[in-house]
From Swiss-Prot:
An example Gene Ontology biological process: peptidoglycan biosynthetic process
Gene for this chain: glmM
Purpose of the protein: Catalyzes the conversion of glucosamine-6-phosphate to glucosamine-1-phosphate.
One term of GO molecular function: phosphoglucosamine mutase activity
Identification of the protein by name: Phosphoglucosamine mutase
Active site positions: S102 (phosphoserine intermediate)
UniProt lineage: Bacteria, Pseudomonadati, Pseudomonadota, Alphaproteobacteria, Hyphomicrobiales
Modification after translation (UniProt): Activated by phosphorylation.
Entry's cofactor comment: Binds 1 Mg(2+) ion per subunit.
Top-level taxon of origin: Bacteria
Modified residues (Phosphoserine): S102
Length: 459
């Protein structure tokens, strides 16, 4: 059943436009606080945020809601999303909240929720929260004597830095490595350069001066141009690109070539398998991961399990099936030996440690397989149910049959935008082009019909 407010990664939208308004954020805080207060003892919530201007507004609104429900709010300030998950466990909180829209522009924002174990909340709990939001919450708020309070937590970012460093053996240092790190003017602008420097690297930090509106703007994991330029300029061994909330990472090698999440997963999986650390003889990725990764892993005797798009689904599959490596091509890398969610800094450290151990350039280390050609198209839509229409479903089935087993067609609705995402993948480029173009035309046509029918109904 589709959820009313929650998408694939929490509640998200444009700041000061529903649902990212202060009054709705306060209601979310009340509903979540009431639910968790009734189930747990500590009544403690930790709240982090990235560097968006609207983070202050939403933070205060959430604090009002949580304290009205009787929760104690511990405010972390700007920290990466994985730091919230880690500190939720470390501070013995009932709940963790991250105010962020990840890789989106500054004018968007979102609310991500974590349970006391550091994992994102299940669909079932999110549904309960939605039901509470739509009720009269005033009758369930705390009494005057039980109203909660808020306090700033000092030194939390240094706890996260130490946590990230401890994912490497004590004898691993990054001496003699020249590293450029693009902080995306986001939540990791302090932690990432500091951790790399403390491990011995020569660090060049760029896009590390957030001003509230420059997060993810022509920088970070969604725009590698400035990172590639800096890597070339200072002759760096590697460039690291984080996103706005620090939960995803892409790399750039010494030749300024992009290394995506699939290649990072391949490196970690192969290295850990050789060292006996890889669990369940495989990894978990999504339907968007490249077929080349699957072929590479299979050639090593390893499995690849695919899930829906979203790191929460990757994590769910990892927990259920016992895998300890998972992720997405976009750069969400989940290593469950260390954490409960994607962590860009920790993933980058594992690659750097591998590079130091093997003593080969990044360009040799991180090109583990030849990617199969992929074509991506986004179709803006008005009717989010257009994929459920029989003519569209039939066309997709027929196109999939035409492509056969050596190619893939993935068509899905975005969980955060009014967009249908189409991905065609296979060795025959001309056929892929034709099939993807056909799908764009069919979806656009039936979405237009939906709009025409809606106009007739209104008239």
């Amino acid at each position: 059943m589709p959820q009313k407010y929650f998408g694939t990664d929490g509640i998200r939208g444009k700041a000061n436009v529903f649902p990212m308004t202060p009054d709705f954020a306060m209601k979310v805080g009340m509903a979540v606080g009431i639910l968790f207060r009734s189930q747990n003892q500590s009544r403690r919530v930790v709240i982090g945020k990235d560097t968006r201007l609207s983070g202050y507004m939403l933070e205060n609104a959430l604090v009002s809601g949580f304290t009205a429900a009787g929760m104690e709010a511990f405010l972390l300030g700007p920290v990466p999303t994985p730091a919230v998950a880690m500190l939720c466990r470390s501070l013995r909180a009932d709940l963790g909240v991250m105010i962020s829209a990840s890789h989106n522009p500054f004018y968007d924002n979102g609310i991500k929720l974590f349970g006391p174990d550091g994992f994102k909340l299940s669909d079932e709990i999110e549904e309960k929260i939605e039901q509470l939001i739509d009720t009269d919450l005033s009758k369930s708020l705390a009494s005057c004597a039980e109203i909660g309070y808020a306090k700033r937590v000092e030194g939390d970012i240094y706890r996260y830095i130490e946590y990230a460093k401890r994912t490497l053996p004590r004898d691993v240092r990054l001496d003699n490595l020249r590293i450029v790190v693009d902080c995306a003017n986001g939540a990791a602008y302090k932690a990432a350069p500091r951790a790399l420097w403390e491990l011995g690297a020569e660090v060049f930090a760029i896009n590390d001066t957030p001003n509230g509106t420059n997060i993810n703007h022509k920088c970070g994991s969604t725009d590698l141009a400035s990172l590639k330029q800096k890597v070339h300029e200072v002759r760096a061994d590697v460039g690291i690109a984080l996103d706005g909330d620090g939960d995803r990472v892409l790399l750039v090698d010494e030749k300024a070539q992009t290394v995506d999440g699939d290649q990072l997963i391949a490196v970690i999986a192969e290295h850990w398998h050789k060292n006996g650390r890889l669990q369940s003889k495989g990894v978990v990725t999504t339907i968007m991961s490249n077929l080349g990764l699957e072929r590479f892993l299979n050639s090593k005797g390893l499995d690849l399990v695919r899930t829906k798009v979203g790191d929460r689904y990757v994590v769910d599959a990892m927990r259920k099936k016992g895998y300890n490596v998972g992720g997405e091509a976009s750069g969400h890398i989940v290593l469950s030996d260390f954490g409960t969610t994607g962590d860009g800094l920790v993933a980058a450290l594992q690659i750097l440690a591998c590079m130091q151990e093997i003593q080969i350039p990044m360009s040799h280390l991180c090109q583990r397989f030849e990617p199969v050609p992929q074509i991506f198209k986004n179709v803006m839509i008005k009717n989010k149910n257009v994929l459920k229409k029989n003519p569209v479903k039939t066309a997709i089935e027929q196109a999939t049959q035409r492509l056969g087993k050596k190619a893939r067609l993935v068509i899905r609705a975005s969980g955060t935008e009014p967009v249908i995402r189409i991905m065609g993948e296979g060795d025959e480029r001309e056929m892929l082009d034709a099939v993807v173009t056909e799908m764009v035309d069919i979806i656009t046509h039936h979405d237009t019909l939906s709009k025409a029918c809606a106009s007739l109904e209104r008239s």
